[in-house]
Amino acid sequence: MKNIAIIGASGYTGAQLTALVHAESELSIQGLYVSENSLDKGRALADLYPVYSHIDLALSPLTEEAKAKIVAEADAVVLATEHSVSLHLAAWFYNQGLAVFDLSGAYRFSDVAQYPKWYGFEHEYPEVLAKAVYGLAEWNAKEVAATKMIAVPGCYPTASLTALKPLKNLLTSAYPVINAVSGVTGAGRKAQLHTSFCEVSLTPYGVLGHRHQPEIATQLGQEVIFTPHLGNFKRGILATITVQLKPGTTTADVAAAYSVYDQAPLVTVKQNQFPKVDDVVLTPNCHLGWKFDENSGYLVVASAIDNLMKGAASQALQCIKIHFNL
């Protein structure tokens, strides 16, 4: 039995992860934590999320005493916190010997020079950053098993990279074009007018400047054009990607490339049949659908995931189970 501490448990991702860990027979929850100044401290998780009424746990403030208790009792800590908060907490818990699974972007880039531009802070822990592994579960399982500092990928990068990485050896120098739509839970639980359900209308945002663009490009090893969109639905991501493949590539070559997922139980691939968000919501699955035009050399692949599950909480759980060989 491995004990897991979850910090940032009051948010959508933290609460979803709590439910997933609670359902695992080989995992237990050491505690649920929020910041000391959170208005949710002391409240039961079920008060915030009645759907989790079967989970009889309260949200504790992350005091110095609580941190010491986590170190003494937990095998791993999951951070569902702001980037600037995870930056410090991840390094502290890692240096105490715990396995850290960080759902923020604070450890996703190996290059410290990326952080001021994309996250607005200087990275203060290059020695910990050097140990971090990008937790794209289907691709980096060996690395996740071997390190105690796991940076869980972003939601858009998970959808995009799952679709693109099998094609790496077939791509030309032309930038893949990624258009992705996410439900409003991707913006978090904090009340904001522009993410209020009655205000949301399908619209692009972060055009040519979203921080997930360099994350995707870094992990793919090739620049991309990435345009996210906010959709008027609660949860889920659909990424539709257009790529140019090398001259002479055949449909059989594409099928062979995607056969890498034949033994991946959470990834489903279909040719000439495209996924729907509703089919992956509340699941840890990724559904891919593709079609290739041999005459033009262009391929369109669509990727559907639940942004709170495969795009966050369930991928963190995948990494936890890989790391502890569960």
UniProtKB/Swiss-Prot annotation:
Organism listed in the record: Shewanella sp. (strain ANA-3)
Record-level GO BP terms: L-arginine biosynthetic process
Taxonomic lineage from the root: Bacteria, Pseudomonadati, Pseudomonadota, Gammaproteobacteria, Alteromonadales
InterPro entries (UniProt xref): AGPR_AS, AGPR_type-1, NAD(P)-bd_dom_sf, NAGSA_dehydrogenase, Semialdehyde_DH_NAD-bd
Annotated Gene Ontology cellular component terms: cytoplasm
Protein name as annotated: N-acetyl-gamma-glutamyl-phosphate reductase
Active site: C155
Compartments where found: Cytoplasm
GO molecular function: N-acetyl-gamma-glutamyl-phosphate reductase activity; NAD binding; NADP+ binding
Enzyme Commission no: 1.2.1.38
Family: Belongs to the NAGSA dehydrogenase family. Type 1 subfamily.
Domain of life: Bacteria
Reactions it catalyzes: N-acetyl-L-glutamate 5-semialdehyde + phosphate + NADP(+) = N-acetyl-L-glutamyl 5-phosphate + NADPH + H(+)
Major subcellular site: cytoplasm
CDD domains: AGPR_1_C, AGPR_1_N
Purpose: Catalyzes the NADPH-dependent reduction of N-acetyl-5-glutamyl phosphate to yield N-acetyl-L-glutamate 5-semialdehyde.
